[in-house]
Amino acid sequence: MKLWQRNTIGAAVSVAACAVIVTTDLWPDWANYREATHTDNVVAVGAVGDADGQTWQVDSIRHLNTVRGIGGSGLPQGTVLNVVTVERTGTPTEIGCTGVITDGERRWSAEAVGGYGDLPPQGISSICGTPGPVQFSFLLPDDVVPTAVDVTTAQGRILVRLQL
């Protein structure tokens, strides 16, 4: 067999091996990453949208400089607590979810109710496993202008992006 034939066979085997590695090892991680940063389920400002068998809409956004509830502690210097209440109807299909707020470049996860999270009013939940409205609290630097809230599954997949 000539040298160029061996080189051609070697190149073909290398390309096939790379394709197998990308398909079996890298592609699932890349797909998980894409699901955690991009979604087709986007609800415009003031609109109502359908996603994951439910309807979603931003009900209210509050900006707080103290936390209600146990202790009512002050927030760290240079921060503000953004409290977003999301109105939703339908039966939740996910046992758990959380909120992630973004300014288009950076992302912040919702605070726990026991931390800086604001206590939800009667009739509003801080967990997604129950039907009805849900509230997310985000401790952000005071110069951040959030553009959207992503409601994500426990695995990080975005269910719906609610533009602010």
Protein language model regions, located:
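Conserved functional micro-motifs across diverse proteins
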Residues: 1-83, 87-164
